[in-house]
């Protein structure tokens, strides 16, 4: 089976925008769910709703893939699953190493969704000598001294960093020097990498802060709406006459 070193997705060479690439996994997840239910075709409106995007944007995204659907029928679900999987490079095996096997790293190692999406956890690596040899998700943890040999021996091009912030840059440098060209960073720090290396940062605390912002805004809108009700009632009361009736408008 081919490995991540032998092929890279064609999305860049075909000029597919990064925003479109970021939405392709959303479409693939929705399409996979439809495929599992043996749904043969899907309209752009139905798929857009399932993926949580605008249908016009979905049609534009699919035009980059050369998929325009059939009027009155929609899109072929199985073909789209294959087409998007191919664009994302998921029709081959991608060996991945996870560095930092604390609580987060162990949780990532135990995540079953990697294998079903074409990502094979080739190795788990940690700097703690006491962790060496201990199995996590059925994979023995290896010491960071073995990092370069592990990368080379497994043809790894994707690395996951789940270390403390203080160790992340050094780990990143070693991964890149060993040949890793794509990094998923869970450490709460910004990594510096050379040209040609892609980094995707996942910061759960930032995502929670964004949710807190939206919660605060919703609370403010609700408070403003509740304050508007008494104001409207006061105005209505002021408009009424001494007997509680609204005065008639006299003709000019």
From Swiss-Prot:
Keywords: Cytoplasm, DNA-binding, NAD, Repressor, Transcription, Transcription regulation. Signal peptide: none annotated. It comes from Streptomyces avermitilis (strain ATCC 31267 / DSM 46492 / JCM 5070 / NBRC 14893 / NCIMB 12804 / NRRL 8165 / MA-4680). Belongs to the transcriptional regulatory Rex family. This is Redox-sensing transcriptional repressor Rex. Modulates transcription in response to changes in cellular NADH/NAD(+) redox state. GO terms for biological process: negative regulation of DNA-templated transcription; response to redox state. NAD(+) binds at residues 100-105. Gene3D superfamilies: NAD(P)-binding Rossmann-like Domain, Winged helix-like DNA-binding domain superfamily/Winged helix DNA-binding domain. Residues 222-252 are annotated as: Disordered. SMART domains: CoA_binding. It is found in: Cytoplasm. The keyword Membrane does not apply. The lineage of its organism: Bacteria, Bacillati, Actinomycetota, Actinomycetes, Kitasatosporales. InterPro entries: CoA-bd, NAD(P)-bd_dom_sf, Rex_DNA-bd_C_dom, Tscrpt_rep_Rex, WH-like_DNA-bd_sf, WH_DNA-bd_sf. Residues 26-65 bind DNA. GO terms for molecular function: DNA binding; DNA-binding transcription factor activity. The keyword Nucleus does not apply. Homodimer. The gene is rex.
């Amino acid at each position: 089976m081919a490995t991540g070193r032998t092929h890279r997705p064609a999305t860049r060479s075909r000029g597919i925008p990064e925003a479109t690439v970021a939405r392709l996994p959303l479409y693939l997840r929705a399409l996979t769910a439809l495929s599992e239910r043996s749904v043969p075709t899907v309209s752009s409106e139905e798929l857009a709703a399932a993926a949580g995007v605008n249908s016009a944007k979905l049609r534009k995204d699919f035009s980059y893939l050369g998929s325009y659907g059939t009027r009155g029928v929609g899109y072929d679900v199985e073909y789209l699953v294959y087409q998007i999987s191919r664009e994302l490079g998921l029709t081959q095996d991608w060996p991945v190493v996870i560095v930092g096997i604390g609580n987060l790293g162990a949780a990532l190692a135990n995540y079953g969704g990697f294998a079903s999406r074409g990502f094979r956890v080739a190795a788990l690596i940690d700097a703690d000598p006491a962790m060496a040899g201990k199995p996590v998700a059925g994979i023995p943890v290896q010491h960071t001294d073995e990092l370069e040999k592990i990368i080379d021996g497994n043809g790894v091009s994707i690395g996951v960093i789940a270390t403390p912030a203080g160790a992340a840059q050094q780990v990143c440098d070693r991964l890149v020097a060993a040949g890793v060209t794509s990094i998923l960073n869970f450490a709460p720090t910004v990594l510096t990498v050379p040209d040609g290396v892609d980094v995707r940062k996942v910061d759960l605390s930032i995502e929670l802060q964004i949710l807190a912002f939206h919660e605060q805004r919703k609370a403010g809108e609700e408070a403003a709406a509740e304050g508007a009700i008494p104001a409207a009632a006061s105005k209505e009361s002021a408009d009424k006459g001494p007997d509680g009736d609204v005065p008639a408008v006299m003709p000019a």
